[in-house]
Swiss-Prot record:
Tissue spec: Specifically expressed in the ejaculatory bulb and seminal fluid.
Transmembrane segments: none
The encoding gene: EbpII
Keywords: Behavior, Secreted, Signal
Signal peptide: 1-20
Organism domain of life: Eukaryota
Record-given protein name: Ejaculatory bulb-specific protein 2
Protein species of origin: Drosophila melanogaster
Length: 66
């Protein structure tokens, strides 16, 4: 029972730190605010667009000419 409890606490801490890292990456791409509209061009062909609203999930990939 104690092993399961220790495993759950460890998993919770690892997941929380991962989610915090994802939030920091979104702030970098979003220009310091959640749901920002900045874009990152990769080879000028693919544009990575962070979610615009607070209820959006994931990133949208679309050609750079949009």
């Amino acid at each position: 029972m104690i092993r399961i409890l220790v495993l759950m606490i460890t998993f919770t801490l690892m997941t929380g730190s991962a989610l915090c890292s994802i939030e920091q990456l979104m702030r970098v791409f979003g220009g310091g605010s959640v749901g920002g509209g900045s874009r990152l061009d990769i080879n000028r062909r693919v544009t990575i667009v962070p979610p615009e609203g607070e209820l959006s999930f994931g990133y949208g990939f679309r050609p750079g000419f949009y």
